[in-house]
Amino acid sequence: MQINFSKMHGLGNDFMVVDCVTQNVFFSPAAIRRLADRHRGIGFDQLLVVEPPYDPETDFHYRIFNADGSEVEQCGNGARCFARFVWMKGLTNKYQVAVSTKAGKMLLKLENDNQVTVNMGVPEFEPSKIPFRAKQTEKTYIMRVGERTIFCGTVSMGNPHCVTVVDDLELTDVDTLGPLIESHERFPERVNAGFMQVVSRNEVKLRVYERGAGETQACGSGACAAVAVGYLQGLLDENVKVSLPGGDLHISWAGEGKSLYMTGPVAHVFDGQIVL
């Protein structure tokens, strides 16, 4: 079966995006892994699938699959690409699009200069809803990871995140700590591991080891999680620039009970066809 797709990225976090509104396509985990292979397939961090709305109050349903074939609840960089894709492909003429995901609903707004703002919803700190094994909600948790003890914050942005504040991001062994945190027993559904260096109350540096994908050039939901945790711990103000290896995102959050907003760029790389 031949399918049409687009290759897109948000700050180097790259995606294969497929319109399943006008195409009838089923992706098995094995097929996704083949397509994600950077030597034998298309190559991507995540596959994004555009489906007809499940809910009459939304415009589309948004599905996300990691390179290992697992389906996940959320992808912030992908959401920005999703908004640009449906407009670019003529699936909508709206500049503000409502979508449902495995985690809930989101509002995506096309801005000028290929920027998209995403209402990421209200950060969730209740351990059972992340999910994270803890007796009660804390701003900071102590965890044993391998031979080390870390101090971290946990939050769900529709998907689970663990954020550790570090003194120097360049000296942080993300390749070792990332997978240990991702598969830590206190996270029954695994977790995205973020490592944040606070530059000022309005700027941080961040690296993210993503669940099922490894370290990526950028992680939108990870940037949101880092700011939410940093704000809750009293380290950050309401508006923060998050510098990732792939570029910058701008996050705005007014505190608990409020929706968090992410703004960042989108790039369309190419369109293609492939036999599935």
UniProtKB/Swiss-Prot annotation:
GO terms, molecular function: diaminopimelate epimerase activity
GO CC annotations, alphabetized: cytosol
Pfam families: DAP_epimerase
Site feature: Could be important to modulate the pK values of the two catalytic cysteine residues: H161, E210
Positions bound to substrate: N13, Q46, N66, G76, N77, N159, N192, E210, R211, G220, S221
This protein's UniProt keywords: Amino-acid biosynthesis, Cytoplasm, Isomerase, Lysine biosynthesis
GO BP of this protein: lysine biosynthetic process via diaminopimelate
Class of the enzyme per the UniProt entry, highest EC level: isomerase
NCBIfam families named in the record: DapF
Similarity-based family: Belongs to the diaminopimelate epimerase family.
Name listed for the protein in its UniProt record: Diaminopimelate epimerase
